């Protein structure tokens, strides 16, 4: 045919010759030669290596070489006594661009139509029949050394795919796939599976299979490939990809698990990996392997010791029994597939069937991501996972899905469960709850905890109401028909509250409504009845959650639990009852408050005398009007608190820069006083990465007094708290899911990313090739070069010297008290972009105010005269000529001696914004509509705006005292 003619050429003698296959070139990260020295070899191995090299040379697989590349070569002896040559290509693989897998997973033999005859072949030395591209051969050179260097070493290079090369499997798959493509096109009604160098052919009849195989032989030979004649299988049982295939059944090949080699985490990890690979055939539910999975917990070091427990030994025995007896079925290509979901213990189990024939099992992982995973959510996840598996196997959705739910429960799941909606998205088949009658599923251990039976989502009528509370001092309590205080060993308010809820569920054997001020405990109690509880390294937490689940499931009466916000001062019986529960656990706090009101003892003394936390003790002192201190500012609504000096307060966050690849996690820290930024790019955002970043910050910025972060796991872990404690650093977090509390660092993230984009798209910094180099250049620009609005120095200068050079520091200011809706006078401590920190007065805490709630203070004329006589200001006599006023100049103008027109700008049509007298709002003075024209006597002139020389003529008339603040509107 035409395709055959294209592949053949006619020589000058007239004989047909096979055109050599076209090699697939490799892509290299560098052309710089990689040379790894050959290590010495014992004489016996050296002789074997010479023999093997000569054999490969005769076959044309290698050739002599003078390449600047070199990889070590060695030999190993097989059980048969024969030697095998191997090349250590790790260094070369590191500079090869990976091609990626073409078959990410094994094909399932269950998709082979039942009763179809098979032929299975194995390609002989497949890698050695596929040529390397000519330009790539020199990269795979090796050296055979000489003993005592008594003669020159012999050097060769591979001409075919070497064993151990990174892309050899992918090139092999591509090469063999090209050879089989004409076979697939001509025999499209045959079922052909190809994996690496193993090929399976199935056809409806033997004659068609023989025709297909004959054509396949020719195509394989034309491609330069050879079939291993001793590995052709034509009769049952067939062995393919670890499975034993019969006419209708498929069984795993018989193996025995060696238990004496199971010593370390790595040993068990490999064992469970192998078992998981054949579990879809064995049908071992997740609950039946829980003890084996539990061995993987603990130390993550691969060489850490592990012990095979008696329970895990029984589970291994079960696996061995299943290997001996388990089987699945080949499919009927004309019949649809169905998915059955069984409510088994621990997690649901899925089974793909055709009629009543088992095709494959499906399971969920033993470990979950969430602390509580509802059983209904697990069913939905398993449905979505298995639907994708069925589509991958046969290209179609299952015809029917059978679930352990009633029609009404399915309807409610579509309404209320997001996981259910995702798992069944775009499914157009049948959802049923009638299982086929067969004995193959009877061994499964079922659970009845699919949907909640005891927990209610709405308040119960005619039921008792109980309020719970817990304290970090270890006390738990509840109030209601009766009161009870429980002493717990926990130093966590949430855990104490959890004990309170468990106690209520145990003490009240009747319908109850529970009200708690812990949202975390409420959500956990709502979900725990049907949830799979994720294992935690915290044994106390595991015990509490398991006890809570057992308590809920043992109840005979329903309950409802809801959340109430604590300390809201709202009217009503719910708030009052919750406060009563609070009082039961906070008696020590009340006594501490009483002692401080009497003696004003400091926070350390309160913590030493009473069972209160540091935060509670500090709050008592800070809320005392006699004990307030200047360096503990309160937070005004709408403003992020800043530090009042370098390293007083940092904000820290993790942002993502996708262009950095593996190092896309960029940890960012900003000093809220100086706005000095430091960032490091890392491979993750766990606690270890955060600590690594902070140590880098300490080396550059110093050690802070306080750090504020979000509520990410890396910042809330015990390891991170211990790290901060060692460095004597205070730590606070913002409100969960509310980024406004981290506004400074969030804005810094945006600034840093913008700078990176500027450098990448418009910079001339080709030497910055790595992510950290790009980051360092951006940080240098932002810290040492940029000067921001309202500042006269860089962030680095401010951070190192502690000087901000703000023109308004120390000046009087009007600030708006949003709580009382009044304007008060204060003194500016620091002034930044869009914010200021103001001291309201002596013995009062500073407040952070948005600049939109600030106005410049205008002192009475008497105070102005006194200040003019004591401060370095320039006295000026009244005159008709303009007075030159510079930025930040202060000029006291004496009163006039005659009557003139009201004050106005010399420039036509301009206006002056003037504050009159004391505690009055600013008014507009000038010719424009709406401006007043008051008479004036004296005023102090200041020009706070950045502008060139301002020339004004001031006309003096008798009247009230005022001071103008010049602002062009």
Swiss-Prot record:
DNA-binding region per UniProt: 811-859
Pfam families documented for this protein: HERV-K_env_2, IN_DBD_C, Integrase_Zn, RNase_H, rve, RVT_1, RVT_thumb
PROSITE patterns according to UniProt: INTEGRASE, INTEGRASE_DBD, RNASE_H_1, RT_POL, ZF_INTEGRASE
Entry keywords, A to Z: DNA integration, DNA recombination, DNA-binding, Endonuclease, ERV, Hydrolase, Metal-binding, Multifunctional enzyme, Nuclease, Nucleotidyltransferase, RNA-directed DNA polymerase, Transferase, Transposable element, Zinc, Zinc-finger
Function summary: Early post-infection, the reverse transcriptase converts the viral RNA genome into double-stranded viral DNA. The RNase H domain of the reverse transcriptase performs two functions. It degrades the RNA template and specifically removes the RNA primer from the RNA/DNA hybrid. Following nuclear import, the integrase catalyzes the insertion of the linear, double-stranded viral DNA into the host cell chromosome. Endogenous Pol proteins may have kept, lost or modified their original function during evolution.
Note: Exact N-terminus of this protein has not been formally described.
Protein name per Swiss-Prot or TrEMBL: Endogenous retrovirus group K member 11 Pol protein
Natural source organism: Homo sapiens (Human)
Organism placement in taxonomy: Eukaryota, Metazoa, Chordata, Craniata, Vertebrata
